[in-house]
C-alpha cells in the first residue's frame, strides 16, 4: 500500500529478540536424539559425513543405560571422549540406520492405471510407467518394536505403511506427502493414501499438529499445512464421506495449532489483520544438522545463538531450508547466520491456510454443520482481505512476503509469490493474467528448464539455479485457472519445460531427483547435503502434469518446444488468435 503508515502489533513476541539469558526448551526430551553431551560430542566429532545418520540410529539398549555408560566413559577422559573411543561407543550401543524400517510393496499397486492411456508420446508413456513403478521402491513400514520400545528409536511410530521421499529421507515428511498423494491417486492407490492420511490424523491427535517429519527431533516444528487439502483430494477421488465425518474435528484441530501458535496481527490505516508466520521457539542446534548449526553459531556473539537456532528451525518449518527469502532485510543477507524467518509473513503459508479454511468450510457444509461452515468461511474472507491489504501489490501483479521489522514487502521473485492463485484465495478473476505479466516482467519465462526458486545465487538449495517440483505446480496450476487461452498456453509451456528436464535427466541417469539445476538441466546442488534420488514429490508432480497435459506433451524427439523464443511465439500466437 504506497504511502500507508504501517503500525505493527505482534501477538507472539518469542523469537523476535531473545537475550542470551533466555534459554529455550530443546526440540524434544530425549537426551540422546535431541540434546545433551552425548549428542554434542558425537556430532562435533563428525563421525559421519551427514549428521542425520547418528540421530537416525536405533539404540541397542535402554537409553538410561546408554547415558550411564557414556557418563562413565566421559569421566575417564576428563569429559572429552577421543574420536576413536566415540566410534567404538556408538558401535557398541547403537544399531545401523534403517533397522526399524522394512521395505513395503503397496497392496493396491496395479500394473496399468488408466491415466497412462492419456499420454500420447510413447516415450513419455513408458517413462510414466517407470515412475508408477517407483512407488514400490519408496514404500516403508515401521517394525512393531518401535511401538513397544519407542524410547530406543528416534523414529515416530506410524500404524500404516507410507511412501517416503527417498535417499536420506527414509521417514515421512509432511508437505512432501501432499504431492506424493496426488501421484498415488493417479496411480489408483487410494488405500495407500488413506493409510498415510490416517497416520497424519493420528499425529494431530497425539501432538496437536503434524511434525516436520517422522522423527522425534522434528516434533516441535511442523511444515506447510496441507492436511486438509490431502483429505479433499482423497474424498474427491473416493467419495469416502464416512472417513471425512470421522476425522473432520481433527482437521479443525490442526488449524487450531496454527491459529494458536503461529499467529500475528498487523495493523494498517486503523485496520487490524490476522496472519500467520513460521515460528519455532525451541533452542539448541537442529539434531540432524548439529555440527553445521553449532559452527554457524560460533560466527556470532554467544548471546544470539538461541535466536539463530530458533530461526533455523523456523526456516526448516517453512520447507524452504534454506533460502535468501529468509535472509532478506538482515544486516548481512549473504550469511545464513542472519536468518530471520519468523520476522516475515509468508505468502505461501497464508495461502495454504486460506485454502484449508475454504475446504473445511465446504466439508462442514456437506456434513450439515452450517455454524462451523460459516466460521471457516468467515476466516477465509478475513484472510483474503489481509492478503490483499498487506501482501498484494497491484502494480506488480503478485503477492509478496511482508517484513515485520522493516514494515515493507520483499519484492524479490519467488514462485511462492503466486501461491494464492494456486490456492484459489483471490476475488478478482483477472489476477491470473496479472500473474502472467509478473512472470514476464521478472524474466522467468526465459528459463527453459524450469521455474527458478529465486533469482539469487546464494549457494542455498532454495535459491537459483535450483528448481523444485512443488513450486512448478504452484505456478503452473495457478496460471491454468485463468480463463485466458494465452495464460493457459503459458502454463502448458512451463509444464513442457519441466517434464522435458525431468525426462532428460531420467534418460541419462535412470533416477528422479528432489531438485534440478535449471542452468544445465542436471540434478540440483547447494544446501546442507548432497542431492537425493527418489523422489516422492518430484514423481508426483511429473505424474500430475502428464495426466493434465498428456495429449500434448512431447519427449522432445520430434519438436523443439523448449527454447525461450517458443514461449514468446506462443504468447504472440495467442494474441493473434484472440
UniProtKB/Swiss-Prot annotation:
<keyword id="KW-0732">Signal</keyword>
<comment type="subunit">
    <text>Homodimer; disulfide-linked.</text>
</comment>
<keyword id="KW-0326">Glycosidase</keyword>
<feature type="binding site">
    <location>
        <position position="168"/>
    </location>
    <ligand>
        <name>substrate</name>
    </ligand>
</feature>
<dbReference type="InterPro" id="IPR008928">
    <property type="entry name" value="6-hairpin_glycosidase_sf"/>
</dbReference>
<dbReference type="GO" id="GO:0005993">
    <property type="term" value="P:trehalose catabolic process"/>
</dbReference>
<keyword id="KW-1003">Cell membrane</keyword>
<feature type="lipid moiety-binding region" description="GPI-anchor amidated serine">
    <location>
        <position position="555"/>
    </location>
</feature>
<feature type="binding site">
    <location>
        <begin position="175"/>
        <end position="176"/>
    </location>
    <ligand>
        <name>substrate</name>
    </ligand>
</feature>
<dbReference type="GO" id="GO:0005886">
    <property type="term" value="C:plasma membrane"/>
</dbReference>
<dbReference type="InterPro" id="IPR001661">
    <property type="entry name" value="Glyco_hydro_37"/>
</dbReference>
<feature type="binding site">
    <location>
        <position position="528"/>
    </location>
    <ligand>
        <name>substrate</name>
    </ligand>
</feature>
<keyword id="KW-0449">Lipoprotein</keyword>
<dbReference type="GO" id="GO:0004555">
    <property type="term" value="F:alpha,alpha-trehalase activity"/>
</dbReference>
<protein>
    <recommendedName>
        <fullName>Trehalase</fullName>
        <ecNumber>3.2.1.28</ecNumber>
    </recommendedName>
</protein>
<feature type="glycosylation site" description="N-linked (GlcNAc...) asparagine">
    <location>
        <position position="369"/>
    </location>
</feature>
<dbReference type="InterPro" id="IPR012341">
    <property type="entry name" value="6hp_glycosidase-like_sf"/>
</dbReference>
<dbReference type="Pfam" id="PF01204">
    <property type="entry name" value="Trehalase"/>
</dbReference>
<feature type="glycosylation site" description="N-linked (GlcNAc...) asparagine">
    <location>
        <position position="261"/>
    </location>
</feature>
<feature type="signal peptide">
    <location>
        <begin position="1"/>
        <end position="19"/>
    </location>
</feature>
<feature type="binding site">
    <location>
        <position position="212"/>
    </location>
    <ligand>
        <name>substrate</name>
    </ligand>
</feature>
<keyword id="KW-0325">Glycoprotein</keyword>
<feature type="glycosylation site" description="N-linked (GlcNAc...) asparagine">
    <location>
        <position position="78"/>
    </location>
</feature>
<keyword id="KW-0378">Hydrolase</keyword>
<feature type="propeptide" description="Removed in mature form">
    <location>
        <begin position="556"/>
        <end position="578"/>
    </location>
</feature>
<comment type="similarity">
    <text>Belongs to the glycosyl hydrolase 37 family.</text>
</comment>
<feature type="active site" description="Proton donor/acceptor">
    <location>
        <position position="321"/>
    </location>
</feature>
<keyword id="KW-0336">GPI-anchor</keyword>
<keyword id="KW-0472">Membrane</keyword>
<dbReference type="GO" id="GO:0098552">
    <property type="term" value="C:side of membrane"/>
</dbReference>
<dbReference type="InterPro" id="IPR018232">
    <property type="entry name" value="Glyco_hydro_37_CS"/>
</dbReference>
<feature type="active site" description="Proton donor/acceptor">
    <location>
        <position position="514"/>
    </location>
</feature>
<feature type="binding site">
    <location>
        <begin position="286"/>
        <end position="288"/>
    </location>
    <ligand>
        <name>substrate</name>
    </ligand>
</feature>
<keyword id="KW-1015">Disulfide bond</keyword>
<feature type="binding site">
    <location>
        <begin position="221"/>
        <end position="223"/>
    </location>
    <ligand>
        <name>substrate</name>
    </ligand>
</feature>
<dbReference type="GO" id="GO:0016020">
    <property type="term" value="C:membrane"/>
</dbReference>
<comment type="function">
    <text>Intestinal trehalase is probably involved in the hydrolysis of ingested trehalose.</text>
</comment>
<feature type="binding site">
    <location>
        <position position="319"/>
    </location>
    <ligand>
        <name>substrate</name>
    </ligand>
</feature>
Amino acid at each position: 500500500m504506497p504511502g500507508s503508515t504501517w503500525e505493527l502489533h505482534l501477538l507472539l513476541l518469542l523469537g523476535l529478540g531473545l537475550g542470551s539469558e533466555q534459554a529455550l526448551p530443546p526440540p524434544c526430551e530425549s537426551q540422546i536424539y535431541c540434546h545433551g553431551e552425548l549428542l554434542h560430542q558425537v556430532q562435533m566429532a563428525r563421525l559421519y559425513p551427514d549428521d542425520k545418520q547418528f540421530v537416525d540410529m536405533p539404540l541397542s539398549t535402554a537409553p538410561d543405560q546408554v547415558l550411564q555408560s557414556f557418563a562413565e566413559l566421559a569421566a575417564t577422559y576428563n569429559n572429552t571422549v577421543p574420536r576413536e573411543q566415540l566410534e567404538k561407543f556408538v558401535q557398541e550401543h547403537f544399531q545401523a540406520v534403517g533397522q526399524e524400517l522394512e521395505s513395503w510393496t503397496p497392496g493396491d499397486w496395479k500394473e496399468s492405471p488408466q491415466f497412462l492411456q492419456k499420454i500420447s508420446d510413447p516415450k513419455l508413456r513408458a517413462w510414466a510407467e517407470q515412475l508408477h513403478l517407483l512407488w514400490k521402491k519408496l514404500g516403508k513400514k515401521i517394525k512393531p518394536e518401535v511401538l513397544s520400545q519407542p524410547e530406543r528409536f528416534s523414529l515416530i511410530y506410524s500404524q500404516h505403511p507410507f511412501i517416503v521421499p527417498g535417499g536420506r529421507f527414509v521417514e515421512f515428511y509432511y508437505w512432501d506427502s501432499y504431492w506424493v498423494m496426488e501421484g498415488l491417486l493417479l496411480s489408483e492407490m487410494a488405500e495407500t493414501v488413506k493409510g498415510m492420511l490416517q497416520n497424519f490424523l493420528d499425529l494431530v491427535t497425539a501432538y496437536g499438529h503434524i511434525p516436520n517429519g517422522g522423527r522425534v527431533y522434528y516434533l516441535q516444528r511442523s511444515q506447510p499445512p496441507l492436511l486438509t487439502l490431502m483429505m479433499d483430494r482423497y474424498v474427491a477421488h473416493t467419495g469416502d464421506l464416512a472417513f471425512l465425518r470421522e476425522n473432520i474435528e481433527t482437521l479443525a484441530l490442526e488449524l487450531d495449532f496454527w491459529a494458536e501458535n503461529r499467529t500475528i496481527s498487523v495493523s494498517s490505516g486503523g485496520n487490524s489483520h490476522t496472519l500467520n508466520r513460521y515460528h519455532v521457539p525451541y533452542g539448541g542446534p537442529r539434531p540432524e544438522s548439529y555440527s553445521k548449526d553449532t559452527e554457524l553459531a560460533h560466527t556470532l556473539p554467544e548471546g544470539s545463538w538461541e535466536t539463530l537456532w530458533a530461526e533455523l528451525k523456523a526456516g526448516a518449518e517453512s520447507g524452504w531450508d534454506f533460502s535468501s527469502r529468509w535472509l532478506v532485510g538482515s544486516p548481512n543477507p549473504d550469511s545464513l547466520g542472519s536468518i530471520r524467518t519468523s520476522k516475515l509473513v509468508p505468502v505461501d503459508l497464508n495461502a495454504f491456510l486460506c485454502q484449508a479454511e475454504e475446504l473445511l468450510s465446504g466439508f462442514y457444509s456437506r456434513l450439515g454443520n452450517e455454524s462451523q461452515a460459516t466460521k471457516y468461511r468467515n476466516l477465509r474472507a478475513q484472510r483474503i482481505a489481509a492478503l490483499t491489504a498487506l501482501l498484494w501489490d497491484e502494480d506488480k501483479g503478485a503477492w509478496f512476503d511482508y517484513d515485520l521489522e522493516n514494515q515493507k514487502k520483499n519484492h524479490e521473485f519467488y514462485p511462492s509469490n503466486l501461491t494464492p492463485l494456486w490456492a484459489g484465495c483471490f476475488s478478482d478473476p483477472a489476477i491470473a493474467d496479472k500473474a502472467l505479466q509478473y512472470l514476464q516482467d521478472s524474466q522467468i519465462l526465459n528459463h527453459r528448464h524450469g521455474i527458478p526458486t529465486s533469482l539469487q545465487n546464494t549457494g542455498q538449495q532454495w535459491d537459483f539455479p535450483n528448481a523444485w517440483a512443488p513450486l512448478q505446480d504452484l505456478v503452473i496450476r495457478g496460471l491454468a485457472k485463468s480463463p485466458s487461452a494465452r495464460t493457459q498456453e503459458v502454463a502448458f509451456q512451463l509444464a513442457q519445460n519441466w517434464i522435458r528436464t525431468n525426462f532428460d535427466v531420467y534418460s541419462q541417469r535412470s533416477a528422479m531427483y528432489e531438485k534440478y539445476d535449471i542452468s544445465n538441466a542436471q540434478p540440483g546442488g547447494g544446501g546442507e547435503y548432497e542431492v537425493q534420488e527418489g523422489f516422492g514429490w518430484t514423481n508426483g508432480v511429473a505424474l500430475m502434469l502428464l495426466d493434465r497435459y498428456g495429449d500434448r506433451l512431447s519427449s522432445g524427439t520430434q519438436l523443439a518446444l523448449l527454447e525461450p523464443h517458443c514461449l514468446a511465439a506462443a504468447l504472440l500466437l495467442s494474441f493473434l488468435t484472440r
